């Protein structure tokens, strides 16, 4: 590949870790395992993600697989759908769940229904990774938990891990799934 590994990969030793580090490990391991996996979203590259979940990935995998986007949640979702339909396995990061609402047209009318609209002959293997809930002093537009809303959409899979161990395992499972998963 045209990039060189500058950052150290996460440790694979059995250790106590944080939820955030578990997410970082899951993304890193799947990008290492499968060249079709890539990360796309606001500030995921140079900045390392809003909370640091993608720190080091840009240096390790390059700009072709760690893609910084403008502030356009609908664009992130649309790019993920298009890439998924061509055989890629995108992980789209939407920084706060509040802004999943901006991408609902793509997620509800396209990603969730592709398998059914094409009689099972098409798949949309993508993950939308986001953060939900209060506690970070995010204010009215950065603290909602809209999980219940997205669970009501037929065809979307929704995963809400409660601990670091489950977060890593379920993220890996979500990336390998052949349907759209909201994580």
Residue ranges and their predicted role:
Residues 5-182:
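Thiamine diphosphate
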